[in-house]
């Protein structure tokens, strides 16, 4: 039986939500199952820093705007931080972390980043 659910940069909220996302949010809002320890992890990176790829520099602002309605927010180069943090979950913010390997070198699955977020989790 699973006791913990970890999300890594998942967009939990969006201004323009798809039908499926609206359905899931309505039927199973936030941390719906009370016996599960929800952990949402979001990355924060300066878009024009050396940690990001050219792709991040080109698409981040438009991606943030399509998800949150605001292009001038922080995030992981694809998903705004506010969207990646699930309401009523244990929330972990990772500095200098991008969404995936194509967005830069330090992403949620990088060895150093996995150790970082793993050690910050309050396991139940």
Which ranges hold each PLM region?
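Serine-dependent carboxylesterase/thioesterase catalytic core
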Residues: 1-55, 76
């Amino acid at each position: 039986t699973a006791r913990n659910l970890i999300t890594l940069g998942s967009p939990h909220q969006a201004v323009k939500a798809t039908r499926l996302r609206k359905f899931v949010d309505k039927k199973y809002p936030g941390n719906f199952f009370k016996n599960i320890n929800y952990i949402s992890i979001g990355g924060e990176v300066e878009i024009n820093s050396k940690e990001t790829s050219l792709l991040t520099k080109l698409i981040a602002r438009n991606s943030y705007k399509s998800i949150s309605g605001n292009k001038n927010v922080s995030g992981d180069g694809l998903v705004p931080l506010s969207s990646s943090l699930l309401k009523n979950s244990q929330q972990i913010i990772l500095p200098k972390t991008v969404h995936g390997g194509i967005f830069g070198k330090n992403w949620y699955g990088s060895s150093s980043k996995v150790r970082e977020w793993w050690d910050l989790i309050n396991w139940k």
